[in-house]
Amino acid sequence: MFNPLYLIRVISCLFLMEIILSEASAKNYNDENILLMDITQINETLDTNEDPPVKRVVIKLFPEVAPKHVLQIKTLSSEGFYNEVIFHRVIGGFMAQTGDPTGTGMGGSDLPDIRAEFSDKPFVRGTLGMARSQHPDSANSQFFICFDNASFLNGQYTVFGEVIEGMEYVDNIMRGEPPDYPDKIVSLKPSIDN
């Protein structure tokens, strides 16, 4: 005997499974221009003796906008260069800067500096830009993530990517120049290496 209620339940279950599976596959990034950055969240355990939690930030790179910068970031992240590197300069309402293994803001990688690749991409909340000295062609390994719009940087620094997931964790990075208890990158790697 046909039971229409049973059919409705089966269809509902199948629909729910489809939603769950599509959300799970959306989180399974497998793209050479996606980076997975795991960062600490010191302020969640500042008053305890516990290790800080590690949170994931997903970054989309812009090879069509800044091919040399993207290549350098991908090369360094594939080598593990950014692992355990602190956020050494974090200014509320502006940005969080990292990428210097010395933690001073004066260091970089052994790779050559990169020529500027300025574009019309604006610096907005979640934008990743390359840090540099006053010389436009001095970017190397240091980069920053904007907390908010920073239009005064437009055309002055190279935009190479954006945060597409986990911006709430970037917002939670400890402030300071340098912070008393700096957060760090635990791991930064291309999603295809995951």
Segments and roles (model prediction):
Residues M1-I11:
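Bacterial N-terminal signal peptides that target proteins for export
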Residues V10-I19:
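Bacterial N-terminal signal peptides
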